[in-house]
Amino acid sequence: MRVMRIKRTDSSFTIDGFRINPKYRYGSYTRNDNDGPRTYNVKDRKVPSVTTILSATQSPEKKRTLENWRNRIGHEEAARITNQAATRGTEMHYVLEHYMNGQGYLNLGDNGVQPRMMAHTIVDNLEKLSEVYGTEVSLAYEDQWAGSTDLVCVYDGKPTIADFKQSNKPKREEWIEDYYYQIAAYSLAHKKQYGEITQGIILICTKDLLFQKFMMSEQLLAKYEEKWFARVEDYYKRSK
């Protein structure tokens, strides 16, 4: 990662060539993780998270694939791999969030080195990032769903929802459809609450520091927004 260079101008400031611009006054919603599936407190209601809806509407095929993997390597080993990946992802997100906000973050523990290098790899591939509107942005679509997206920004001149992902191995596009659904859900909520989004981007770094970028054009985003509405409808039908 480059040495952070900050230049302040009125209410915004520039870091390494991109501008932090508080264009929107983003609110925040508290998250509930301890009483069943994840929800967010939106006004006076508990609203299901995007990941809760995705999990509840998984296809039987995807559920079988996950269960077969657990059975093949053993449930204890599967839990260890899952927990390691979650810890690595959390640390990587901390580094990226602080960098995008013009702050420093450094975990000197053994579990901080690899995620920091992964975050640096992602940052070094953000040459088309020109503005940051917000990080860890809380979004809700009325009382239908809520969640937090990693980054709302201007990328390659277009208002963009971006998500950072860690991975144990390189991804094929057919493996990341749930990521497309997440971007679509956040895009719809942002349009409803704040302003236009015309593309999505998923930025992945593996534990071996392989970088991948998956772009969602305006057309692909619109396609998955429609598909997301269908998933939400299915979720609420199942919940009755």
Annotate the PLM regions.
Residues 1-146:
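Metal-dependent nuclease catalytic cores that hydrolyze phosphodiester bonds in DNA/RNA
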Residues 2-7, 20, 156, 160, ...:
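DEDD superfamily 3′-5′ metal-dependent exonuclease/proofreading module
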Residues 134-239:
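Mg2+/Mn2+-dependent nuclease catalytic core
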